[in-house]
């Protein structure tokens, strides 16, 4: 039996929850039924009041609805509640919670049937009794279907992002046609426009970190939400590239192959975001020069900066994305660079001061090179040579050079630059 206690020693009666009607809900039940590790552990308490919870030592943490921290384990327990839409956006709800709210009342407000299941939690922390599944979640798990619980799905635009994120995690699932229709209706009504930027980024970032991030963007694009959230990305579909370099031709298809390749390489979030936006400039290539994309690197930079401002993207993701968009072509071509060109590239990337960020840029470029039809398993030797060049350039003691030019400080920067070139050349690169 699955245990929800903090440790083996918790498999005894818990005085904080003794006598409470407690259920594990949502992702914990879904993942248990799928045979997956349980990541999210949410509890709902039926028939209690805030005062009763506080009297047991629980600490209130919810601002918009009653959520409490267990006095010992710090696990979150929420009172069963219902919600009613009162205004646009994901915060436009009034919440009702009282002892007369049933478990089924609480479950019906949830987004998908596969997240609207529960199981009673015994006083020793074990799950007991049958899975409570009033809305067909187990059947939808079996058919690998994302299906909304009720028409109230349309009241919360975050649910569009959540469905898309779940698609990136559970790539074999599909969106039920009736749920897709609701999502399209929400997008057309502009509901996603009311989302706060931080929440949009939070869901996109979580989706990028899943195994198949391309599925997130496929779902958003299919329902019409992508063009409202990331129009710079949406316009890439249908833009052709040279078939000799890109057998997949379509720039949007290529971009999705790149983010999935970055995911398969188990890269961190900054690399995956850089992979997502590295070719945005191709969406504004003049039609008369297609399928070539001369200057797309520079054209993409202001778009990336605008997205990062708009969605409050973290600095590490923004900085890497800008570097990769600007330099990915040069990194691809670097196998033909001489020592001078190699050092210039390293210095533009600030690789000597931030070598780890440079390594991440190389990962994004490898994902770009391999994210092409027929190139998925091709070797990408550029990082080996560039990292050897970085090691050689880093062997120069800039402080020692500065001392030699103490009387002529204007020449220090150039002298260090020349010394690095000589070191790279002597390394046979």
From Swiss-Prot:
Keyword Lipoprotein in annotation: no
Q: Which GO terms describe its molecular function?
A: ATP binding; CCA tRNA nucleotidyltransferase activity; cyclic-nucleotide phosphodiesterase activity; magnesium ion binding; phosphatase activity; tRNA binding
The UniProt record gives the binding positions of CTP as 27, 30, 110, 162, 165
> What is a single Pfam family found in this protein's UniProt entry?
HD
Q: How is the cofactor bound?
A: Magnesium is required for nucleotidyltransferase activity. Nickel for phosphatase activity.
Boundaries of each HD domain copy?
251-352
Q: Which PROSITE patterns match?
A: HD
Q: What is known of its domains?
A: Comprises two domains: an N-terminal domain containing the nucleotidyltransferase activity and a C-terminal HD domain associated with both phosphodiesterase and phosphatase activities.
Record's miscellaneous remark: A single active site specifically recognizes both ATP and CTP and is responsible for their addition.
Q: Which PANTHER family match?
A: MULTIFUNCTIONAL CCA PROTEIN (PTHR47545:SF1)
Please give the subunit comment from the record: Monomer. Can also form homodimers and oligomers.
Q: HAMAP family annotated for this entry?
A: CCA_bact_type1
Name of this chain's protein: Multifunctional CCA protein
The uppermost taxa in this organism's lineage are: Bacteria, Pseudomonadati, Pseudomonadota, Betaproteobacteria, Burkholderiales
